[in-house]
Amino acid sequence: MKKSNSIPLLILVTGLFFALDLLLGGSSGFAAFREEGLVIGIRLPRALTALLCGAALSLGGLQMQSIFRNPLADPHIMGVSAGAGLGAALATMAGIGSGIIFPAFAGALICSLLVLAVASRTSSSSTLLMFGVMLGFAVNAIVAILQFSTAAEQLKLFYSWSAGSFSNMGFTGIYILAAVLAAALLTASVNAHGMDLILFGDGFASFCGARPGRIKFLALLSSSLLAAAVTSYCGPIGFIGIAGPHLARLLCRSSSHRRTIPCSLLCGAAVSCAADLLSQIWSTPLPVGSVMAIIGIPVVMAILLGSRPLSREQ
């Protein structure tokens, strides 16, 4: 596929999946499309949420993979989703029902700040990656203890949130997520050349006059905020952060961030809308997180079996 054709084609594919998700995102199919209230009140927010969440997680994954030079890195590996899970678990223990989103966002934000604090003290990608992984393990252990000591009735809301869903966000949440995505996209665009240099190593980036620490900090800040916003509203949605950037590199045949940033946004949005559509076409809707795993696992396996080092391809 030619580079010049990849973005227009991705726009068409993403628009197609979005339209299908809007039209067929439920068991009643086209018949329900005549009901304006159903479309505007339920299906449109859900489809927009899927579109924005996919784009956000894919953009976050692209930045993480670039600064760590690892095709399997994504925002969740840094403990952000685990922090959101801790906030959600504490909220359910406290008997907070509809307010689970705010504790989840607070937990994700605290973990993000811890990672950013470490990032400001070290320039080692491996040290930062190990800290994020260990932070995630530690927080998940606390969540497991809380689950063990919480009544089953209180855990229903937590289990529902942790399964992942695009149905929990209204238009206010959509506006918030769109604003976070716009800010992150601006940050990534400004940081694009620096991330190109980082692909060749910190030493090369420094030799070219860039500041690797600043580049990594901006990428981590952007990715963490995206993951925190998405996870707090929708629960942990995995694999988009890995699959989206990988598909983008394959389609645009480049690792230059001027090309991969828009392609990653579109790939993530398309995959997310497709997963949401597949989760809704059955008589009983399936958890979108599980459907995403089914879609994403083959992509991850393909990366593992045929991966090559990330490098800038012209």
PLM region descriptions:
Residues 1-314:
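Alpha-helical transmembrane segments in inner-membrane proteins
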